[in-house]
From Swiss-Prot:
The gene is murB. The keyword Metal-binding does not apply. It comes from Methylorubrum extorquens (strain PA1) (Methylobacterium extorquens). This is UDP-N-acetylenolpyruvoylglucosamine reductase. PROSITE patterns: FAD_PCMH. Its main location: cytoplasm.
């Protein structure tokens, strides 16, 4: 099915959709690596009800992929078949605070969530200042930094499943472990409830500044990068294993292992998604051969490879 015919089928099944449907939309500008092919169809829902109606009407055979802020993501050069969904800040970007309770849309950047909590003198969420992603991604992978994890402060999650039905998940039902949640893959998170602790605003903001300074000193945040590439294996640190295997500065095409922090891959300019993913696989091989450790990707890789020329 072509992108045009897919959109026609969607509009016929859900004529009252208010969100935006785009065909063959480039995703490179939506990812921090600035690489990747197009989405066959990109849908940006107007709100949660619009998302629900869309999913309820969509043919179950059509694959659905969710795109967040694009910080922890490689979109392969052949793009994404079916539908990619991106939740916008207008409908899914609010933060509301009531006492110690924080309700956030999943398009809210993690750094903004940390700031909102600090402004309300709520402690426990400052670690989000060091995570370059959105709340939705943090929920999906139990994101963490600087001694804190999403699981530490989460109360409840709201989402829409593939049938268009609203689902709620308690903290226990999320099944968090290191960089993982057990929530069903077909659920698109739309909102979350967190709980902070009463604290001193100045102290919380000072902690956030410390997190920011540590990140700027140790990570190539001004480069085109996707953040931490590999999960830390049990009994080791990914960056140390990569360094010991002689991979610091390693180059493949336009991609490079960062000299500053070797658990970061960067696009030096002109890289393809295949360059970046291929470099990551080469790093995994060298680490395995050198130390016996098996590194697992933390960055999500989606889509299909480009067809041979």
């Amino acid at each position: 099915m072509t992108a045009h015919s897919l959109i026609d089928a969607i509009r016929a099944a859900a004529p009252d959709l208010r969100g935006r449907l785009l065909e063959n939309q480039s995703l490179a500008d939506l990812t921090w690596f600035r690489v990747g092919g197009p989405a066959q169809v990109l849908f940006s829902p107007a709100d949660e009800a619009d998302l629900s109606a869309f999913l309820a009407a969509l043919d179950p055979a059509v694959p659905v992929t969710v795109i967040g802020l694009g910080s922890n993501l490689i979109v392969r050069d052949g793009g994404i078949p079916g539908v990619a969904i991106r939740l916008g800040g207008k409908a899914f970007g609010s933060v509301e605070i009531d006492g110690e309770t924080i309700r956030s849309g999943t398009a809210v950047p993690d750094m903004r969530l940390a700031k909102a909590a600090a402004e309300a003198s709520l402690d426990g969420l400052a670690f989000f200042r060091g995570i370059p992603g959105s709340v939705g991604g943090a929920l999906r992978m139990n994101a963490g930094a600087h001694g804190g994890e999403t699981t530490d402060v989460l109360v409840e999650v709201r989402g829409i499943d593939r049938k268009g039905e609203v689902r709620r998940f308690t903290h226990a039902e999320m099944g968090f472990r290191y960089r993982h949640s057990s929530a069903p893959d077909d659920v698109i998170f739309t909102g979350a409830t967190f709980r902070g602790r009463p604290g001193n605003r100045e102290a919380i903001e000072a902690e956030m500044e410390r997190v920011t300074a540590a990140r700027e000193a140790a990570q190539p945040i001004r480069e085109r990068t996707g953040g931490s590439t590999f999960k830390n294996p049990e009994g080791g640190k990914a960056w140390q294993l990569i360094d010991a295997a002689g991979c610091r500065g390693l180059i493949r095409g336009g991609a490079q292992v960062s000299e500053m922090h070797c658990n970061f891959l960067i696009n030096r300019g002109g890289a393809t998604a295949a360059d970046i993913e291929g470099l990551g696989e080469e790093v995994r091989r060298r680490v395995r051969d050198h130390s016996g450790f098996e590194l697992h990707w933390e960055i999500k890789r989606i889509g299909v490879e480009a067809s041979p020329a």
